[in-house]
């Protein structure tokens, strides 16, 4: 296997909170997949949940070398936890097509948050 890309992102949690205060659920609707949306709606820390998902998706877009453009959207990158609680990525739509085109066979996700920040790193392998 070879590393195709590496992306890292850091999000100020207060910034996400500010956007939610101004625009309600619009940011969450744009960023989250349907499965993530269902979790967010009942999560005990919805702002922190959204900030962490946003960081992973930005990191993934950077790892793919594309950013969020040309048909790619945040909600095409879905963060979920495996049976051990490890964060993983599931792709949909154009993100999945891009991964198939690039020959992606594995994606590694690491995620951390502290009081003020959430950060994530994504590595993609072929």
From Swiss-Prot:
Q: Which SUPFAM superfamilies match?
A: 4'-phosphopantetheinyl transferase
GO CC annotation, single: cytoplasm
Tell me where it mainly resides.
cytoplasm
| An annotated Gene Ontology molecular function | magnesium ion binding
Transmembrane region(s):
none
Q: What is the lineage of its organism?
A: Bacteria, Pseudomonadati, Pseudomonadota, Gammaproteobacteria, Enterobacterales
The UniProt record gives the binding positions of Mg(2+) as 9, 58
- Superkingdom in the source lineage: Bacteria
Listed name of the protein: Holo-[acyl-carrier-protein] synthase
- Record has Isomerase as a keyword: no
Function comment: Transfers the 4'-phosphopantetheine moiety from coenzyme A to a Ser of acyl-carrier-protein.
**Compartments, as annotated in UniProt:** Cytoplasm
Q: Which EC number applies?
A: 2.7.8.7
Give the protein's cofactors: Mg(2+)
What's the catalysed reaction? apo-[ACP] + CoA = holo-[ACP] + adenosine 3',5'-bisphosphate + H(+)
Q: One GO biological process from the UniProt record?
A: fatty acid biosynthetic process
Q: Which UniProt keywords apply?
A: Cytoplasm, Fatty acid biosynthesis, Fatty acid metabolism, Lipid biosynthesis, Lipid metabolism, Magnesium, Metal-binding, Transferase
């Amino acid at each position: 296997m070879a590393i195709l890309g590496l992306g890292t992102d850091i999000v100020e949690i207060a910034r996400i909170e500010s956007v939610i205060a101004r625009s309600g659920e619009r940011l969450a609707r744009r960023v989250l997949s349907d499965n993530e949306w269902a979790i967010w709606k009942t999560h005990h820390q919805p702002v922190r949940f959204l900030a962490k998902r946003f960081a992973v998706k930005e990191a993934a877009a950077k790892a793919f070398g594309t950013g969020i453009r040309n048909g790619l959207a945040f909600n095409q990158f879905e963060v979920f936890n495996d049976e051990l609680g490890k964060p993983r990525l599931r792709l949909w739509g154009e993100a999945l097509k891009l991964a198939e085109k690039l020959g992606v066979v594995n994606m590694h996700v690491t995620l951390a948050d502290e009081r003020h920040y959430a950060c994530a790193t994504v590595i993609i392998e072929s």
